[in-house]
């Protein structure tokens, strides 16, 4: 018999997370490692669990994540976005609570590109009067 699983893709900055939810005890595995081993800060782990708290499904699903690109914060928020989308696939009734918490919206903020003649996106070279 095929095991039930729900999939969701989350994105944030340059990070892309492919999330699979499987009925289980609430274990979160990111790129083959436990989430506490993979993410260095407790605040990121709390951020990542937000969709489960909003839908009151904490401990109902095991989460298997494949994430790449970006840094820790972008990856954690991409995982959060993916979990929210996968939960929506599991039960469409979660939509209103997830939407109210802002978990279904892809954060559009990206790094601004570097412009020619400047050191960074907006930082200009040091000005010398003489």
Swiss-Prot record:
Task: Name the InterPro entries on file.
Answer: Ribosomal_Su5_D2-typ_SF, Ribosomal_uS9, Ribosomal_uS9_bac/plastid, Ribosomal_uS9_CS, Ribsml_uS5_D2-typ_fold_subgr
**Location of the region described as Disordered in the Swiss-Prot/TrEMBL record:** 98-130
Q: What is one process in the GO biological process aspect for this record?
A: translation
Q: Mark out the compositionally biased spans (Basic residues).
A: 111-130
Q: Which Pfam families match?
A: Ribosomal_S9
Spell out the PROSITE patterns in the cross-references: RIBOSOMAL_S9
GO cellular component terms, alphabetically, are: cytosolic small ribosomal subunit
The superkingdom of the source organism is Bacteria
**Which segments does the entry list as coiled coil?**
none
GO molecular-function annotation terms? RNA binding; structural constituent of ribosome
Alphabetically list the UniProt keywords: Ribonucleoprotein, Ribosomal protein
PANTHER family membership: RIBOSOMAL PROTEIN S9, SMALL RIBOSOMAL SUBUNIT PROTEIN US9M
Cross-referenced HAMAP family: Ribosomal_uS9_B
Q: Which family does it belong to?
A: Belongs to the universal ribosomal protein uS9 family.
> By what name is this protein known?
Small ribosomal subunit protein uS9
What is the protein's species of origin?
A: Staphylococcus carnosus (strain TM300)
Q: What is the lineage of its organism?
A: Bacteria, Bacillati, Bacillota, Bacilli, Bacillales
- Gene label: rpsI
């Amino acid at each position: 018999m095929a095991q039930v699983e729900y999939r969701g893709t989350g994105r944030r900055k340059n990070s892309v997370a492919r999330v699979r939810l499987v009925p289980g005890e609430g274990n979160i595995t990111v790129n083959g490692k436990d989430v506490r081993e993979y993410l260095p800060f407790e605040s990121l782990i709390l951020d990542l669990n937000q969709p489960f708290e909003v839908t009151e499904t904490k401990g109902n699903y095991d989460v298997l994540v494949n994430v790449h690109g970006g840094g820790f914060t972008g990856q954690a928020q991409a995982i959060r976005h993916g979990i929210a989308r996968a939960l929506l696939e599991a039960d469409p009734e979660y939509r209103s609570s997830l939407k109210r918490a802002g978990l279904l919206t892809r954060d559009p903020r990206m790094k601004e590109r570097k412009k020619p003649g400047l050191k960074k996106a907006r930082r200009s070279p040091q000005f010398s009067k003489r």
